[in-house]
Amino acid sequence: MASSRDRAYVTVYSPTLLTWVYDYYVLGFNLRYIWGCPTDAVLLPFFAENFSRRHLDVGVATGYLPARVLASPWRRAAAHRQHLTLLDINANSLRASDARVRAAAPGIETTCVEADVVADLPPVLASVVEEERARVEKAGGEAGSSSRSCLYDSISMFNLFHCVPGGPAKLRAISTYKALLADHGVLSGCTVLGERHATGWFSRWYLRLYNRKGIFNNINDTREEFEEVLNKEFEEVDTWMFGMVLLFRASKPRREGSGYVDLLA
């Protein structure tokens, strides 16, 4: 059973924090001044660049990023053709995010999934893989390769892994959720790295504090660990560092010997 400390990253996202604190303190102050990666100048454009009409957002917080992207005039006008799946371990986050994206883009189709990212795919998403398997068998083609694929064209994991406990083992989520990505699809995300990547004494102190409180679980996370897993699971991988934040984008998912093949078996 998870300890109360390990559960802190789940319970910290109360309705009050999500409504009054998260956007300004976490996305505004912390990312810019503590971690060195401003949301408006770096994360929002990066999210928008890798956002598609069939998108899965894993670890949604307040829904700030998809809502901002969907609020653009041309996205808003095409909201009726947009499908967005929101996944989070916290029900408060899901409710807040769903309401926010629906307000930003009336007519959008959303699906909310409450699940732990380090567990197996929840049934509603495992069924997507099964649907794709059935489509492939009927069409006699390759999974994920058709424009009619049931899989997602893009998956995002922003500000997720630095919260999740489990050490390097938590990165199995990349393999698990890669199974939902079409061959032409893109996985993108960002994470605050561990103590080795601290940019100064204050960011190191702040990082240790967050880890002691259980808000973060990333004290030993490294760029090399993420790159190793991403390169194992994808043919094309790009990573960038902004302060202590690693941005990653991966495409051309490898199928052999992966969780994807296991799920289709």
UniProtKB/Swiss-Prot annotation:
Keywords (A to Z) from UniProt: Methyltransferase, Transferase
What phenotype is described for loss of this gene? Completely abolishes the production of nectriapyrones but accumulates a demethylated analog of nectriapyrone.
> Domain of life here?
Eukaryota
Q: Which SUPFAM superfamilies match?
A: S-adenosyl-L-methionine-dependent methyltransferases (SSF53335)
**GO MF annotations for this entry?**
methyltransferase activity
Query: What reaction does this catalyse?
Result: desmethylnectriapyrone + S-adenosyl-L-methionine = nectriapyrone + S-adenosyl-L-homocysteine + H(+)
BP terms from Gene Ontology: methylation
- Disulfide bond keyword on record: no
Documented EC number(s)? 2.1.1.-
* Described function: O-methyltransferase; part of the gene cluster that mediates the biosynthesis of nectriapyrone and its analogs phomopyrone A, acropyrone and zaepyrone. The nectriapyrone biosynthetic gene cluster consists of two genes, the highly reducing polyketide synthase NEC1 that produces a demethylated analog of nectriapyrone from one unit of acetyl-CoA and one unit of malonyl-CoA; and the O-methyltransferase NEC2 that further methylates the NEC1 product to yield nectriapyrone.
Hey, which family's this protein in?
Belongs to the methyltransferase superfamily.
* Protein name (database record): O-methyltransferase NEC2
Please state the gene responsible for encoding this protein.
Answer: NEC2
